[in-house]
Structure formats: C-alpha cells, structure tokens
C-alpha cells in the first residue's frame, strides 16, 4: 500500500485517542478550560457514566464569535505564545481538547464574552462543524458533550461500567476542586444528590476547609500543616497524622503549580518521610502543593498532562521530605492522642454478673497494707530505662504534685503487665510499654549511628546461631551494614553464624531470635532499596528486640522513667510499626462515658 496523507477527520480521531481516554478525560479537559478562563464557579453534570451526556458550565470570561470559530480547530489556543512552551502558566496549553472531543462525540459550545452583545453557539459532530449562530447565555461558557465515542464505537467496549466511569469523573472533579479552593464547584447527575463545594477563603485555613469538605472530617481532625521553602521552590499543604492511614496510595493528592499530578518522585518522597511512622502495608493521606517557577518544571511530558518533570528533582524531593518530617515531629504527641476518640465510641456500660461478688477473693494488688507479689517499690529498677532523672526515686504519692503537669503525667499503676496508666491534670493516659520503649530504643540507635556509631559489647563467648545456608549467606552479605549498629556477625561453617558483638543499647538480647527476624526482613528487601532505608529497617528490628516486653512487671520508678524518656524522645507518639504508643482520655472524655456530659 502506498504512503498517503490521512483525512483530517481520521487524524483528529487518532489525536483524540491520546487526549480522550474515557469520560473522565473529557471532564478534566473542560474543567481545566473553565479554570483557565477565570471562572469563579464551575458546574459539572454527567449521565450514564459520562457516555450519554456531560455538561460543564462556568462563569468565566467566555469567548468572542471569532475565538469560538477557532476554538474547535486543532492546536488553536489563547494560552500559549510562540516562546512560552517552557514557561507554561495555565492548565491547558495545547489546543487539542475541544477538537479531540468534537472528533469522537456530539459537541455543543455556547459562550458569551463581555464585549459581545449576546452569546454564540457552535456544534461539532464527529469532526463536522456547524455554522455559528446567536444564543442565549448570561455569562461564561457552557459545553455539552453527548454520545461520547459514537464516531469510534470500538472505544466503547473498553469503558468500564457506568458506576465506575462516574466515580472516575467524581475523582477528577475532587482533585481540581482541591487545587482551587477559591472556586466553587458543583457535581450533579448519575441519579445522585448534587454535591457543592463553596468557594473558600484564601490561605491555609481556606485550603483546609476545602480539603476537609472533600476528604472528610477524619482528615480535618488529623491534619498537620506542613511547609518548606528554598531556592524558589515552596512546598505546603496538609498531612494526616500516622493514626489515619489507608491500604493504598490513593489518598495522596499532589499538585504542582496548581496542576493535579501523579509523580513517582513526589510519591517516593512522601513514603520516605513517613517511613519511621507507618508499617510497610499502610499508606499516608496527604495533600501537598508544590509551587515553583514554571521554567523549572516541564508539564508537556504526557498527553493527559498528569506527569511533570523537574529541572532540580533532588531539591523538590528534599523539601517534601523535610516539610513532612518537621510537621510530623512537631505534632507527634498530638497524633497519638487522636487515637482515643475512636476507642471512646466503642465503650459500653458494664453490667455486673449475677450473684454476690466477694472482693476479698479478687487477685489484685492491695492499695495499702498487706503483702503483694509485686516487686518492692524501694528496690532499684533493672537497666531497662534511664532512671537517673529527678523522678526516678520519687514515690507515686510524692511525685504526683509536680509530675501531674508533665505532658504524660505521673504513673499510677500497670495493668496486665503491659499497659501503664498515668494521671495528668486533665485526665489519664494509657501507655503501651513495649511500643513506647521500642520507639525510644529506635531513636537512640539512629542518633548513635549519626554520631560516633553504636557502642558495642563484646561477648566473652560468641553466640553460635544455626540456620540454613541461604540465610547464613544473606546475613554475612549484610555484615558490614549490621556492624554499623554494633552487631558483629561472621560465618561459622556452612550452616551457622557466630555473633561476637551486640549493641550495648539492647542489653542482654536473644541473638538467635534477632538474627532470624533480621534475615526474614532482608529476604524481602529489593536490591534497589537505598542503604539508608536498609539501615533503618535494621534499626527498627533491633529496637523491637531490645525493648521491654509486654508481660514484665514494672516498678513505679521505672514507669515514671519511661514516661520522662518518652517526653524527651522525638516521634514518641508512634512505635516503629506506626501504631500509637499511648492514648489520652481527657476528664471530659471520661465524664462522657459516665453520662455526665
């Protein structure tokens, strides 16, 4: 077959295949046009998942009759000058949306410019334009798209159900509404009640209002404001506390110069910032806005304009990580307290069992007098915590007056040999002793690694740990990384490892259990995992093994010492796996449980 020039209608339909993938693509392009036109309000309607009908109406600047005639021609745009391709300041810029939509659907445009005496309307059906005629419209532009893909019926079979396509439209509008809280949006159709997001006030409060309206009250209650700026690049937005997570990354909303994007660089930076707070199977919820000179970012790298390329990607990543880490560290104590709200809703009034209860047969520690199986308060604690602080040797009744004003209060008791209950001026706090100490040890290991290295203790008799040859090879291959944390191992034949030194911070540790856990984690590591992340995984595993275990009875001075160390430790609100280390119940919360409020 000889080479020949394709007809214009076929060319437009091929081009439309890149721009118009599904109904949500149409909505995205048309709403972006409305935003670029200076609209203060955008109304979106869809029916049949967008296949049967899509209507976008705005109160923007509109178009003149002459502009309307050009608007449906390919590569005709008012948003780009000859030299502006590397300095794009609008959401749209290629001039492909309207002609692409008109090539595969029945398109109707009605618009009115302030300089025109009345509105004008134009129709395009399968690429064929109708003459422009007068119309009635008070302001802005109204675009109707009907029978999407009627001109390319083969595309219809690749669409999902109406419900799925409608949800994709909803997600597109949500993202654009988050990007522009100063614009009012209405989403209607699909046999659902209309949703309206009113225009918000400028600045962070208005942005949080819009994000809360879209992402829900949970996000608003757990939102932490973050921000960082350097060398002309600014990162701002809101990140949810580690107590609010999702099973996937769909709750991460990223915007560059007001454009919603899905950028692997930014997603990786978010994951890195939360690495010390979340388990690997949970994902944070964030809304981040990156602002920089338009010449420092290329938005023309994807047909749907959902990806960007940064000139200085390293700077952008560093700013995002810094902003998130700083915000999470600043609000660390508050994030743990938020976990109590959900627990309160699960409380139910208790009922006594039938019959008479003999309190004398109850196996509890006496309040005063008598004997007890608990350790004597006068004994010195074991070396699990640093008890050299001023509160270490203070009896509970003596410590209360001054310790009640401390953030984590004064220890009152231990329940189930696992949880510490402390009293504050305004309520009580329940601490998971293992999770809390695990975070303390983890932060100490990191600090030692950043300073002069982790101090080691030499074993007089090396521990010989037997395991399969593959596991031995895996551990020996990472011996240099393990030694950075004071764990010195070497091969001891084909099926064993000799442990010669262990970290001093861990005290007496079960080397066999620690090595097996480390080997299991190493088996899951991707070879591309950065060294820093591998080291943090090692530190987290060591911290878990070096922490006080659930089931150990603690003395009052040990409990108070742990509380004081938590107050002095960054990120102490969560353990290394992302779970809260403590929950706080205010006096008001307690009164609610008993119907006093």
UniProtKB/Swiss-Prot annotation:
This is DNA mismatch repair protein MutL. Transmembrane segments: none annotated. GO terms for cellular component: mismatch repair complex. GO terms for molecular function: ATP binding; ATP hydrolysis activity; ATP-dependent DNA damage sensor activity; mismatched DNA binding. This protein is involved in the repair of mismatches in DNA. It is required for dam-dependent methyl-directed DNA mismatch repair. May act as a 'molecular matchmaker', a protein that promotes the formation of a stable complex between two or more DNA-binding proteins in an ATP-dependent manner without itself being part of a final effector complex. Coiled coil: none annotated. One of its GO terms (biological process) is mismatch repair. SUPFAM superfamilies: ATPase domain of HSP90 chaperone/DNA topoisomerase II/histidine kinase, DNA mismatch repair protein MutL, Ribosomal protein S5 domain 2-like. It holds the Pfam family DNA_mis_repair. SMART domains: DNA_mis_repair, MutL_C. The keyword ATP-binding does not apply. Belongs to the DNA mismatch repair MutL/HexB family. It comes from Rhodopseudomonas palustris (strain BisB5). InterPro entries: DNA_mismatch_repair_CS (IPR014762), DNA_mismatch_repair_MutL (IPR020667), DNA_mismatch_S5_2-like (IPR013507), HATPase_C_sf (IPR036890), MutL/Mlh/PMS (IPR002099), MutL/Mlh/Pms-like (IPR038973), MutL_C (IPR014790), MutL_C_dimsub (IPR042120). HAMAP family: DNA_mis_repair. Keywords: DNA damage, DNA repair. PANTHER family: DNA MISMATCH REPAIR PROTEIN MLH, PMS, MUTL (PTHR10073), DNA MISMATCH REPAIR PROTEIN MLH1 (PTHR10073:SF12).
């Amino acid at each position: 077959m000889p080479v020949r020039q394709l007809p214009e209608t076929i060319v437009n339909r091929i081009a439309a295949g890149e721009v118009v993938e599904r109904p949500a693509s149409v909505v995205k392009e048309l709403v972006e046009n409305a935003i670029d036109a200076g609209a203060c309000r955008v109304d979106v309607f869809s029916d049949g998942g967008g296949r049967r009908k899509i209507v976008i109406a705005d109160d923007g600047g509109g178009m003149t009759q002459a502009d309307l005639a050009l608007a449906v021609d390919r590569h005709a745009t008012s948003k780009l000058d000859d030299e502006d391709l590397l300095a794009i300041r609008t959401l749209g810029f290629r001039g492909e949306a309207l002609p692409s939509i008109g090539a595969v659907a029945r398109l109707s445009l009605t618009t009115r410019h302030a300089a025109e005496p009345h509105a004008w309307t134009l129709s395009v059906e399968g690429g064929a334009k109708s003459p422009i005629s007068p119309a009635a419209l008070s302001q802005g532009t109204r675009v109707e798209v009907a029978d999407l893909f009627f001109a390319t019926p083969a595309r219809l079979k690749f669409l999902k159900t109406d419900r799925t396509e409608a949800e994709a439209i909803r997600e597109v509008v949500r993202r654009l509404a988050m990007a522009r809280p100063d614009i009012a949006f209405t989403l209607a159709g699909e046999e659902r009640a209309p949703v309206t997001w009113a225009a918000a006030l400028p600045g962070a409060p208005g942005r949080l209002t819009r994000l809360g309206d879209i992402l829900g009250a949970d996000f608003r209650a757990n939102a932490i404001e973050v921000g960082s700026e350097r060398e002309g690049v600014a990162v701002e937005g809101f990140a949810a506390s580690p107590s609010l997570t999702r099973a996937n990354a769909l709750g991460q909303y990223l915007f560059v110069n007001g454009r919603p994007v899905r950028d692997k660089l930014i997603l990786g930076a978010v994951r890195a910032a939360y690495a010390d707070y979340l388990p690997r199977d949970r994902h944070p919820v964030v809304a981040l806005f990156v602002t920089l000179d338009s010449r420092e970012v290329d938005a023309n790298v994807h047909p749907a304009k959902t990806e960007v390329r940064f000139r200085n990607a390293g700077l952008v990543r560093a700013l995002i990580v810094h902003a998130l880490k700083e915000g999470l560290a600043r609000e660390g104590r508050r994030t743990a307290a938020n976990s109590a709200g959900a627990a309160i809703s699960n409380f139910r009034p208790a009922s006594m069992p039938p019959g008479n209860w003999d309190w004398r047969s109850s196996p509890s520690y006496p309040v005063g007098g008598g004997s007890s199986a608990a350790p004597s308060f006068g004994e010195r604690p074991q070396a699990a915590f640093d008890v050299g602080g001023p509160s270490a040797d203070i009896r509970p009744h003596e410590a209360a007056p001054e310790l009640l004003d401390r953030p984590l209060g004064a220890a009152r008791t231990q329940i189930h040999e696992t949880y510490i209950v402390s009293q504050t001026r305004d309520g009580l706090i329940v601490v998971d002793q293992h999770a809390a100490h695990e975070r303390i040890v983890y932060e100490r290991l990191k600090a030692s690694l950043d300073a002069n290295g982790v101090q080691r203790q030499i074993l007089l008799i090396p521990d010989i740990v037997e395991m399969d040859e593959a596991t031995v090879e895996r551990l020996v291959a990472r011996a240099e990384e393990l030694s950075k944390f004071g764990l010195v191992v070497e091969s001891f034949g084909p099926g064993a490892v000799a442990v010669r030194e262990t970290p001093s911070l861990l005290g007496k540790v079960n080397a066999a259990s620690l090595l097996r856990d480390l080997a299991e984690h190493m088996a899951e590591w991707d070879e591309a995992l950065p060294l820093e992340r591998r080291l943090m995984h090692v530190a987290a595993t060591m911290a878990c093994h070096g922490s006080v275990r659930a089931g150990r009875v603690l003395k009052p001075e040990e409990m108070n010492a742990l509380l004081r160390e938590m107050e002095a430790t960054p990120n102490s609100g969560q353990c290394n796996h992302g779970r809260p280390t403590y929950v706080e119940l205010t006096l008001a919360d307690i009164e609610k449980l008993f119907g006093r409020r």
